[in-house]
């Protein structure tokens, strides 16, 4: 993202969301849930790329960066399913999403310590479908893992400030 003008604050955010995504990938791997790790990694790194065009959304709420990011990535030849993470990370509640997209959306919450039960439930349900296990079989280990990732949120927030 640095090559296309991403400010340091956006790069740091992508780094911290990617850190949470790596923790989620490790958790899902421990539970033998099959997913496309490369998709999750790319989505976590690029989900807010549209904030290059909508810089005000780095410090204020807004959704203009979502479609802008998807368009920007598609224009640079990024695979459509990865580019879609620009929208699905924020619109997961209204879109049909693959597990990978839901993991990106969850990483974007957990990095700062935020728990979103409805999103976590969708991740658990999608993960159960991928590994042919019951939702309740996965609930406790995944919920405990989500809690551990969120618990590190304050430390990540402390590292989010750039000079």
Predicted regions and their residues:
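Divalent metal-dependent catalytic cores for phosphoryl transfer on phosphate-bearing substrates
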Residues: 2-4, 33-129
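A positional/architectural concept
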Residues: 5, 9-29
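Charged/polar positions within long, soluble alpha-helices
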Residues: 26, 112-115, 151
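Charged phosphate-binding loop/patch that engages nucleotide di/tri-phosphates or the phosphate backbone
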Residues: 135-163
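Residue-level recognition of alpha-helical structural elements
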Residues: 6, 10, 35, 99, ...
């Amino acid at each position: 993202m640095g090559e296309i003008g991403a400010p340091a604050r956006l790069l740091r955010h992508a780094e911290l969301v990617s850190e949470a995504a790596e923790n989620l990938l490790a958790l899902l791997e421990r539970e033998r849930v099959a997913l496309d790790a490369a998709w999750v990694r790319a989505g976590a790194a690029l989900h807010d790329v549209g904030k290059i065009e909508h810089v005000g959304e780095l410090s204020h709420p807004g959704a203009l960066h979502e479609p802008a990011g998807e368009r920007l990535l598609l224009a640079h030849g990024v695979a459509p399913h990865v580019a879609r993470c620009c929208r699905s990370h924020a619109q997961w509640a209204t879109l049909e999403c693959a597990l990978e997209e839901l993991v990106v959306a969850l990483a974007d919450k957990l990095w700062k310590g935020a728990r979103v039960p409805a999103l976590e439930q969708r991740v658990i349900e999608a993960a159960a479908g991928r590994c042919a296990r019951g939702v309740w079989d996965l609930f406790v280990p995944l919920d405990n893992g989500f809690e551990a990732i969120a618990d590190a949120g304050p430390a990540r927030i402390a590292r989010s400030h750039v000079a």
